Amino acid sequence: MCIRDRFFVPESPRWLVKAGKADRARAMLQRIGSAEYAGQTLKEIEHTLQKDNHKVAWSTLLQPQIKPIVIIGMVLAVFQQWCGINVIFNYAQEIFASAGFDINGTLKSIVATGIINLVFTLAALPLVDKIGRRKLMLFGASGLTVIYVLIAGAYGLGIMGWPVLVLVLAAIAIYALTLAPVTWVLLSEIFPNRVRGLAMSLGTLALWIACFLLTYTFPLLNASLGASGSFLLYGVICAMGFIYVLRNVPETKGVTLEALEEQLAAQHTKVCASTQPRSAR
């Protein structure tokens, strides 16, 4: 797939402008919009690249206009891991065994999780642009919340076997359709050009640290809370993730980086103003 994309996926307009190929960038923008849209967007890109044409220090990430975006990116990266789905992949044998499956049934269930993950990841590709990033994130967080509560209830009530398998497969399907691909799309879209490299590095670091903590804390959680309590905890985390996305994450579909930066900066200013004591105003 990577080799195929190397020949068929076009370069981004920003890269073309940066490489001195403004005419090709204009032509590409005209393919997805009008000539007026292409001209306006090209001007915004050129203005941004001229402004950002200097070496960026890590301290830039703490600037008032940039910091809220970096925080959103890191929270999304951590949430993608702490939603708990990788526990199912990493500890599938233990989870299915505790649900009453024998060795043969456990192996078949693990194969089923891989197939479901692949199918729904491919199905997500057209939906990201059709439905929108924010809606998919909200659907994923809310769907996983409900499913984890049901799994916790099943373990708590001693309901084993196929009901647990169906719920686990549903959780994987929702994750593969939403949080798994959309998180990376958002991370690639929300950061301004001048800090994208640094911010993406920080977001990726946060994601893998979260993955490490998730993977190595599940045995401890499972030992102290049991499967029911562990999945209930992941359900609470997903509910918190839903609230965070609802309040803080804008829709990036069809929004330029320049407009998105202004929108998030205005949102940050509004929040700061609302939390400032009246005596200080």
Model-derived segments and their meaning:
Residues 38-47:
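Short, well-structured alpha-helical segments
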